[in-house]
Amino acid sequence: TNSHGIFSLNYGARLSYWSWNKEWLFSPRVSLGIIPSFNEDFTFRIATGLYYQAPFYKELRDTVTTGVSTKVRLNRNIKSQRSFQVVLGGDYKFKLMNRPFKFTTEVYYKALSNLIPYNVDNVKIVYYGGNIASGYTTGIDFKIFGEFVEGTDSWISFSLMKAQQKVDGKSFPQATDQRYNLNFFFSDFFPGTTRWKMTLKASIAD
């Protein structure tokens, strides 16, 4: 805390070892939060870190088809999928109809490497069994949260996103790619009592 505001710094790291492929993983992360002295209704955040996701069994399987025969082996040279992430965000607290509300915005970028791509065929998912792809995920999120009805919380969120991957020099959307997502959660009490509550959820995405 100083004349410029309140600062909050959090940092840490995780060290792990995977015996299957004898892989050591070091995952540092750090975040900084600031409540400026000129207006304590604002909060600003920045966070970054390096994250890993170890493969599960289906991602280890490397399938090779020769003629009419198919061989499956478990890839001992496979690596954990890696994501370097940066997030910038902010909150603004305000009053509306004399009730508390909060508006939140976050912008993020994730640089992805050592990806294990997969194909989706109806309900069947087939993994390539190797770290042959890279990519990125980026987007911006907006959310307004508060008491649209006094005494109970509701919120509306809207996200713009893009997720791409590159395999053999060719770029295309990831299977999880969405361009927008609108979510709505509303709660209200039954007339004359606060013991009974009704909630309504809706989501639109593409």
Task: Name each model-derived stretch.
Residues T1, L25-R29, T43, R73, ...:
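Transmembrane beta-barrel architecture of outer-membrane proteins
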Residues N2, L15, I34-P36, L50, ...:
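Residue-level signature of outer-membrane beta-barrel architecture
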Residues T1-D41, T65:
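Signature of Gram-negative outer-membrane beta-barrel scaffolds
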Residues N2-S3, F7, Y108-A111, G130-D206:
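Gram-negative outer-membrane beta-barrel transporters
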Residues Y11-L15, L32, I46-L50, G90, ...:
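Transmembrane beta-barrel strands of outer-membrane/channel proteins
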Residues S37, D41-K95, A205-D206:
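Outer-membrane beta-barrel translocator/channel fold
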Residues N21-S27, Y57-T63, L115-V123, M161-P173:
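Outer-membrane beta-barrel translocator domains and adjoining extracellular loop/strand segments
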Residues S37, N77-Y136:
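Membrane-embedded beta-barrel scaffold of Gram-negative outer-membrane proteins
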